[in-house]
Curated annotation (Swiss-Prot):
Pfam families: Ribosomal_L11, Ribosomal_L11_N. One of its GO terms (molecular function) is structural constituent of ribosome. Forms part of the ribosomal stalk which helps the ribosome interact with GTP-bound translation factors. It comes from Prochlorococcus marinus (strain MIT 9301). This is Large ribosomal subunit protein uL11.
Amino acid sequence: MAKKIVAVIKLALQAGKANPAPPVGPALGQHGVNIMAFCKEYNARTQDKAGFVIPVEISVFEDRSFTFITKTPPASVLITKAAGIEKGSGESAKGSVGNISKAQLEEIAKTKLPDLNCSSVESAMKVIEGTARNMGVSITD
């Protein structure tokens, strides 16, 4: 019989920089998980994605063991990096704070495709384009 899952914890952590300090320590500690083991494994898996925030979904089992799945970085982070801006517009309707090309949009869509509820790159591009528009980033040809 498979192990019983006691909790599912979702965190967004800097790639390669997980440490026992909050938010990791308290979230895992209350379920009795070995925090250092998680930190070492997470850092090893994400060291090639340095500079990005990588969401992680941790499944904690009743024997205090765990498994985790890393997701792709949030679309907003990928868009701000591609546009070369620090953050999106507070008021997206008033004006553009940056631009990204269709090629950059397609690259972001291909990166995010496994985590999006889409089956094709074209539909993923529409989802990412909507996110960019809401951030005040315009798409250029």
